[in-house]
Structure formats: C-alpha cells, structure tokens
From Swiss-Prot:
Subunit structure as annotated in this protein's UniProt entry: Probably interacts with PlsX.
Pfam families: G3P_acyltransf (PF02660)
Entry protein name: Glycerol-3-phosphate acyltransferase
Organism lineage string: Bacteria, Pseudomonadati, Pseudomonadota, Alphaproteobacteria, Hyphomicrobiales
Membrane-spanning parts: 4-24, 53-73, 80-100, 110-130, 133-153, 154-174
GN (gene name): plsY
NCBIfam families associated with the record: glycerol-3-phosphate 1-O-acyltransferase PlsY (TIGR00023)
One GO cellular component term noted in the UniProt record for this chain: plasma membrane
Membrane topology qualifier: Multi-pass membrane protein
Enzyme kind, highest EC tier: transferase
Pathway: Lipid metabolism; phospholipid metabolism
Enzyme Commission number(s): 2.3.1.275
GO MF, any single term: acyl-phosphate glycerol-3-phosphate acyltransferase activity
Coiled coil: none
C-alpha cells in the first residue's frame, strides 16, 4: 500500500469518525443519544428522540461523510477514492473519539456509494424506502439493500468496486447482528418508535 493510499484511508477515517448524531442531539439539548433506544449514534436512533429534523440532519451528514471522503480524495488522486470511502465507513463504525464505539454504518455506506457509483446508490435508496414502507424496520431495509448493492455493482455499474462493497456489506450485517436476532424473535423496534 502506497503512502497516498494510506493517507486517503486515514483522511477518510477521520472524516467518518465525526459523530454527527451525538453532536446534534447534544446541541439541541436532548442529551446523549447513546442513552436512549438502541444506544446507536445513527439517524434511526436519533429519530427515537422524537425530533425528525435532527434525524434527517444526522442521516444527511453521516452520508455526506462518505461522499465527501470519496470526492475529495478522488479529486487529488482518483485511485485513492475507494480507500478514502472505506476509511470513512470504518471511521463511522469505530470512531476514536468515542472509544471505537460508533454507528452501524448504513448512511455512510450509502454516502460512499453515492461518491463511487451514484446509479447503484439510487437502487439502494429505492430498496431501502420500499422495505421500510412495507415492513417499518430500518434494520431489515438496510440489510436487504446491503445484499443487493454488491450484485448491482457487479452487473450494472462498477464490478471493480463490488468486492469492496461485499466486505462493507458483511460488516453491516455483523454490526446488525443484535437487530437480526430481534427480527427473528419479533421484538425489533419499528421506525419512529420511541424508547
């Protein structure tokens, strides 16, 4: 791995590690989002505060971390864009500022995808929205989309980055293992539910 790739990975990690969900809820006087609901710092848990605007802002900013990392690194050296995106994804999952305990990575995953293959990002968004509308489970929507993305990349857009998204999708599944257990048990919280 060259110096440039390492630099892109570190840059992406630092950008991805900004915990927007935590920062926004604290700034709004809602306390520590890690102490409510699932304890996650992502948009779905921020929504459990009852503040839809903050949840939307968290979703947008967490996605932008991934997109910005890809586009900025790619501007200077196109071959580093993928590594910056991976760094942003890992930074969101394992932020140094929070003892390496971050979010589940779905919004940042989408942001990286927007930067690398926006057409497939649209497929992700359509699948997520359809599953969320039909079943009201954010986790199920995310997991379904994460299965489809590497396949879509391979056949429709960018087979050279499909392997990256296979790895990222596996990590998304690992981070959602508790959600998967709750889905199977019928106890998973639905979108918009407080607590």
């Amino acid at each position: 791995m060259t110096y440039g790739l390492i630099l892109a990975l570190v840059f992406g990690y630092l950008l991805g590690s900004i915990p927007f969900g935590l920062l926004l809820t604290r700034a709004a006087g809602l306390g520590d989002v890690r102490k409510i609901g699932s304890g996650n710092i992502g948009a779905t848990n921020v929504l459990r505060t009852g503040n839809k605007g903050l949840a939307a802002a968290t979703l947008l900013l967490d996605a932008l971390k991934g997109t910005a990392a890809v586009l900025i690194a790619g501007h200077f050296a196109p071959e580093t864009a993928v590594w910056a995106g991976l760094g942003a994804f890992l930074g969101h999952l394992f932020p140094v500022w929070l003892g390496f305990k971050g979010g589940k990575g779905v919004a940042t995953y989408l942001g990286v995808l927007i930067g690398l293959a926006w057409q497939v990002a649209l497929i992700f968004a359509v699948i997520w929205l359809a599953m969320a509308f039909l079943f009201r489970y954010s986790s199920l929507a995310a997991l379904t989309a994460a299965v489809i993305v590497p396949i879509a990349l391979y056949f429709l857009s960018a087979p050279q980055i499909a392997v990256l998204f296979v790895v990222m999708s596996i990590i998304v599944f690992i981070k959602h293992r508790a959600n998967i257990s709750r889905l199977l048990a019928g106890t998973e919280g639905k979108i918009g539910a407080k607590g």
